[in-house]
Each structure stands twice: as structure tokens, then as C-alpha cells.
Amino acid sequence: MYKRLVQEFFPKLDFENLEKYVNLIEFSNKNFNLTAFSGDILWKEGIFESIFTMNFIVGLVNNKENKKLKILDIGAGSGFPSIPFLITNPEIELTISESMQKRCQFLKDISEKLDLKFNLICKPVQEINPQKFDIITARAVANLEKLEKITKKIHFPKTLLAFIKGPKVFNEVQNCKNCNYKIIKVNNNINKKIFIAFKQVS
């Protein structure tokens, strides 16, 4: 069902490569326990949600010059949300920070087998050198207070911090003093409450 929904919503994507990516996750999951998603749920909450929400996040960026966007995905694990989005938008400049070695190795394999070009940093985000990213994002990594701390040294003015969250985001905002995140609900077709906590660094 959701595999078909992905095809319908994103007809211009490289669907063959996307299927290969899903198959690699399913195969590697047997040995590495990369994600709890499998089957139709993988297409729903892994693939569709990633592409849909990343499209939404990119829409929050003031990109009148239509420049190549530099995106950092923190703790992508098996590649969500950035890899499905990269497959559909190969023109972006993607960097992934992933500290778990087994997941990092999987991402290296993905890059080689699917011929995807992205920068992979196999260490915690706190240890990477500051770069001028347009967007810093993460999904299911940490609460807002922790994300605020670990990204503090790596962003620049005008960087958009945009984190994919569930309904508990409102509690996280209350607990993150002086963080000043805005919350927006992402209307979607998978009957799931998805929110983006975002702000532009001043």
C-alpha cells in the first residue's frame, strides 16, 4: 500500500534505487538490527515519512537563489530521513553524522551500492568541525534540549534547525528554556501526528 503511495506522490524519483535501498535495509536488519521498520511499515514510516517531511523542511528555507542546499542529518542510523530524500533530490549536498560503527558501515555500503554521493562522518556531531549548513535536522535522536546543546558549536547564523518530532514535542519545548523553537504540524497521508520543531539561528 505505502510503496504504491510513494510512487504516486513522488513520480519523478529514482524508484529503482529506492527499492534497492529498502532491500538493503531488510537484508542488513537480519544481522545489524538497524531499524524496527520492515515491510509496509518501512515504506510508510521510513520512506514516505522521510521524503514528505524533508520536502516540508526544505520549504521552510528562504532559497530564492535556488542554490544547492547543504544539509546535515544527525544520527541518521539506517538513513532516515536524509537518504530517501537524497535519492529523490540528488542535487543536495548531504552530510551525515553517525557515531555507531555498524550503522556507519551500513551507510558506507549504501553509498557504494546505490552510487549516492554524501559526506559521512563516523563520530558524534559534537566532534565535527563547524560548517555552513543551510539545514541541520534529526529524527528520533534526542529531545530538543539535548539537540540544542549538541548543535550549538556547529551551526552558523541563518542555519535552519529543523527536527522531526511526535506529539511529545510540546513537552520538550516547555523543558527547553530559551530555545525559542516554533512548532508546526505536518499534514500527511499516513495518519500519523508529525511535527517539526524549527528555528533559524540568529
From Swiss-Prot:
UniProt keyword list: Cytoplasm, Methyltransferase, rRNA processing, S-adenosyl-L-methionine, Transferase
GO molecular-function terms, A-Z: rRNA (guanine-N7-)-methyltransferase activity
InterPro entries: rRNA_ssu_MeTfrase_G (IPR003682), SAM-dependent_MTases_sf (IPR029063)
Pfam families: GidB (PF02527)
Enzyme Commission no: 2.1.1.-
Positions with a binding annotation for S-adenosyl-L-methionine: G75, F80, V125, Q126, R139
Keyword Cell division: no
Domain of life: Bacteria
UniProt-annotated location(s): Cytoplasm
GO cellular component: cytosol
Class of enzymatic activity (EC top level): transferase
Primary localization class, coarse: cytoplasm
Function: Specifically methylates the N7 position of a guanine in 16S rRNA.
Cross-referenced HAMAP family: 16SrRNA_methyltr_G
Family membership: Belongs to the methyltransferase superfamily. RNA methyltransferase RsmG family.
The name this protein goes by in its record: Ribosomal RNA small subunit methyltransferase G
UniProt source species: Mesomycoplasma hyopneumoniae (strain 232)
Highest classification ranks of the organism: Bacteria, Bacillati, Mycoplasmatota, Mycoplasmoidales, Metamycoplasmataceae
